């Protein structure tokens, strides 16, 4: 299945840009270090365990193209944390499907998501084990130094989508012919 068809099926907004158009700022790692989400040091794909931000930026810049997408989810109100978690889970499920579709089509890719990886019900880090699925684990855009607000502006994908909604962004970095 073509990646854009999968995004259309899930009513996700998307566009494609060149990786050189992405705005990187190592300072975005500071948001992770403040531990507002509670995953700093609690998930292998979150700082500090995910690696140095400079190395993640270098890895991202090694790709040519970026399929940028967003999912918009309705929530009860701006305090609906459970609704936000359900929405994040749905967004991460879409990222996993995109990765599988890309790999099935032999596309060398690296997906970046929103927030903690979420690939496992409980991250192996909590029990002191290594990551169970390092090939499927997802690093967040912010942990990789991506300026998501600038990304939204540059791509024309809205960052705010109305009252009682939450919007999540993802990027599938890839090499080769554009999708």
Where do the protein language model's features map onto the residues?
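Catalytic cores of enzyme domains
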Residues: 13-43, 47-179
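TRNA-binding/sensing appendages of the translation machinery
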Residues: 1-17
């Amino acid at each position: 299945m073509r990646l854009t068809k999968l995004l259309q099926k899930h009513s996700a907004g998307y566009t494609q840009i060149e990786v050189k158009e992405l705005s990187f700022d190592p300072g975005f790692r500071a948001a992770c270090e403040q531990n507002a989400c509670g995953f700093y040091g609690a998930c292998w794909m979150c700082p500090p365990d995910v690696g140095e931000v400079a190395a993640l930026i270098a890895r991202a810049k090694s790709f040519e193209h970026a399929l940028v997408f967003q999912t918009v989810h309705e929530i009860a109100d701006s305090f609906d944390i459970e609704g936000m978690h359900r929405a994040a889970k749905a967004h991460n499920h879409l990222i996993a499907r995109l990765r599988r579709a890309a790999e099935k089509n032999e596309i060398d890719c690296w997906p970046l998501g929103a927030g903690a990886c979420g690939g496992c019900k409980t991250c192996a880090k909590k029990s002191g084990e290594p990551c169970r699925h390092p090939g499927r684990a997802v690093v967040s855009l912010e942990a990789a130094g991506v300026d998501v607000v600038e990304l939204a502006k540059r791509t024309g994908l809205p960052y705010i989508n109305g009252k009682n909604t939450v919007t999540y962004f993802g990027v599938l970095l890839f090499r080769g012919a554009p999708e």
